[in-house]
A protein has these predicted regions:
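Short, acidic, metal-binding catalytic loop of nucleotide-sugar glycosyltransferases
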Residues: 23-32
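A conserved acidic beta->alpha catalytic loop
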Residues: 39-48, 65-67, 90, 96
């Protein structure tokens, strides 16, 4: 019998984080799944690490060459997927145990693509050590939804195609994929639950040179051992965002008085979405410069946004 969900974990030469990301999948309350860990031409011990997990639902796949981005590993996962639903998980990210059950419930109610809230842990690389990221709809031309928090029907990518190579694009491949799904009139659903923890490599200079896993280990233990982790972490993070100087998303008195979870989350989503919508409109409606403007710069080559990110993370530019 085929699994209901195929979880695709793209990875490249960072084996120490894999037990934590894969472990967060195997602890899901929804268990009808397979896990495809797809190496982007890995040359380290990732295959051995995956093999030691010892769960028949977990399969290792390795591309013959390194392609430089998660797009091609994700496409290979799509080709080999047996599930009717597709989920993505960054190799250094974690899911809360209810992630799949919440998002699949939204799909069974009629959505084609569902996504939850993500906690971004920046590792103290700037003055904000963490922030909540409700996936944002800036309008039909700008949809920011981290792949780690997404589950979609397999039929979506069967119809519109998979991930495009980053060298074909001016922007991020995930944004382009969501835009294609949106313009093809697929139905998106935001589930108002914290379901994923993201450790963005673009917030950690040279992280691929060090390849640490201590953050994933610590957060994994907290998710497993803390009572009411989701609600407690929402409150802690909103407090931290207020103290650290981020725009206060809701009245602080509601946090201090431990308002009901649904009210707290609803207000946070509503207020944060308003701010991000305003920001998004500014991003997509900047006036075009007139020809000959002295501030004009040569257009960036396609894929440059990914090449710059690779260098920051400690990876070389692809040839």
């Amino acid at each position: 019998m085929d699994p209901a969900v195929t979880v695709i974990i793209p990875t490249y030469n960072w084996s120490s984080v894999l037990p934590y990301s894969i472990g967060s999948v195997l602890r899901q309350t929804f268990t009808e799944l397979e896990v495809l860990v797809v190496g982007d031409g890995c040359t380290d011990d990732s295959e051995a690490v995956v093999g030691r997990i010892g769960d028949p639902r977990v399969k290792w796949i390795n591309l013959p060459t390194n392609t430089g981005h998660q797009s091609e590993p994700n496409n290979e996962g799509l080709r080999q997927a047996r599930g009717q639903f597709i989920a993505y998980l960054g190799h250094d990210d974690l899911w809360l145990p209810h992630h799949l059950s919440c998002l699949i419930s939204a799909l069974k109610q009629g959505a084609d693509l569902a996504y939850g809230m993500t906690l971004y842990v920046t590792g103290g690389s700037d003055r904000y050590d963490r922030c909540l990221w409700p996936p944002c709809d800036y309008g039909p031309d700008f949809r920011i939804i981290p792949p780690t928090c997404v589950v979609h029907r397999r039929s979506v990518t069967d119809h519109i195609g998979g991930w495009r190579h980053y060298r074909e694009l001016d922007w991020y491949p995930d944004l382009e994929l969501w835009l294609r799904a949106y313009t093809a009139n697929y139905r998106f659903a935001c589930v108002p639950r914290l379901t994923a923890i993201k450790f963005p490599a673009v917030a950690r200079r040279d992280v691929y040179k060090m390849r640490p896993s201590h953050e994933q280990a610590a957060w994994s233990q907290r998710i497993q051992n803390e009572d009411n982790f989701e609600i407690a972490e929402l409150i802690r993070t909103i407090r931290a965002m207020a103290v650290q100087g981020r725009p206060q998303p809701i009245e602080f008195t509601k946090i201090a008085s431990m308002a009901p979870y649904r009210v707290l989350l609803h207000d946070f989503l509503q207020e944060t979405r308003k701010r991000l919508m305003r920001r998004g409109r500014r991003l997509i409606s900047r006036p075009a410069r007139s020809k000959g403007d002295a501030t004009d710069a040569a257009p960036e080559p396609k894929g440059n946004v990914i090449d710059v990110a690779r260098e920051f993370k400690g990876l070389p530019r692809m040839p």
